[in-house]
Amino acid sequence: TGRGSAYNEYEYIGFGITLDQGRDMLAEAEELLIKAWTGKNIDHHGHYWQSKFPELRPRPYQKPHPPLVRACISEASVAEMAKVGRPVLIGVQTVDTLRHRLDLYRDIMHDAKFSDSQVEYSLDQTWVQRGLVVAESDQEAQDIAGPALDRYRKHLLDARLNYNTSEVPVVDPSRPRPPGEVLEQAFLAGTPRRVAEQVDELRDIGARNVMLNANVGQIELQHVERTLRLFGEQVIPKFKDA
């Protein structure tokens, strides 16, 4: 089960709360979720929720409860999850940052006295994120991914300008872009051979799973379909025995 706090203020406005309140609510939401999955005669008195019910039906099939996975952008969130041995979904970061965070995650789990097998299990369930464009040439892939990322970034900026309240500071356009808005960091893009090299690079730093988005910024359907076909036929087979 995935849980994540959103990262845009406007995503909270419809619920009548702020982004900071949403972050504070996350821990209690997970606590209540586990109580509901595992307990009976639930009587929860928290800061945000007051809940009382006999039990959840039907009961979860997985025991003691479905595994929880949290989407994490910040290093602090990754460290927090490592302390409790929970897998994470890491948003787009540079290769060097990913290497550091995966090493940090492993070290913190060991410091928290998790066994080697528990650390390996959590790393096996941890994912990193990238966009994906596979084409006949590296240049064509860049020509598709670049404008797509620009459209995606414009959508985010427009939504923040249109829907954030006046109390929310406007992002300084001169500030360096975060990794998720930088083409070379946000995408695996190129020929099947080049994309396989990029996957290899992620594997070499300790990433074991990659969440891929083949339609960042409303890429045209024929390009999305070609990406999926080329990736499935010419990239995935290179890693089947890995």
What kind of feature is each model-predicted range?
Residues 137, 219-230, 240:
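Short glycine/threonine-rich loop-to-helix capping motif typified by GTGT followed
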Residues 73-96, 101-102:
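A conserved active-site cap/scaffold subdomain adjacent to cofactor or substrate pockets
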Residues 6-17, 83-84:
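Acidic/polar active-site rim loop that often engages polyanionic ligands
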Residues 5-9, 94, 132-134, 216-218:
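Active-site-proximal loop/turn and secondary-structure-junction residues that shape catalytic pockets
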Residues 1-3, 68-71, 88-91, 124-131, ...:
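Hydrophobic faces of well-ordered beta-strands that scaffold small-molecule active sites
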Residues 20-56, 96-208, 240-242:
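An alpha-helical appendage that flanks or caps ligand/catalytic pockets
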Residues 92-95, 213-225:
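Glycine-rich, proline-tolerant flexible connector loops at the mouths of alpha/beta enzymes
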